[in-house]
Amino acid sequence: MHIIITRPKEDSLDLINKLINLGHSVTHIPVIKIEKLEIKKVNLENYKAIIFTSSNAIKYMNVEKFNSKIKCFCVGSATERTAKNAGFTNTFSSEGTVDSLIELIIRTHDNKSGKLLYLSSEFISKDLDTDLINAGFSVDRISNYTSFPVEKIDEKTLNFIKKNPPDVFFI
């Protein structure tokens, strides 16, 4: 089976390798590019927990004082694994959606215990911070990365796809 993966390569390497090991042909065609935004250093001591909806937020963290024991709420297991690899030890993972992450935070974290830090993309699909603020939490959202479309696919890849049409797309 020929499978096309459209996520950025660093976010797809595990999946690409698994699919290849299962005997599939995999073509990687990223449709977005991720880039760090310059932000001032964040002092984690000002927060009781951090919220991550993407591994990119962890990858592009710019912290003044790192606290490995700070509570980390992660959108899914891949993001939680990235947080652990970055040195965080107090991690919690939801079921892979922003709604399940909001529910996890509301259910397990005292909204009076202090401020939450939400590191995110410049562009988000859901206002997690607004939902938590409406639930009584104090949240600072800082965008530390952005995304933009990839505008050109190289000719070699296009020719390969024309000769080998894909069976499946992973977006």
Predicted regions: what they are:
Residues 1-171:
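Signature of uroporphyrinogen-III synthase
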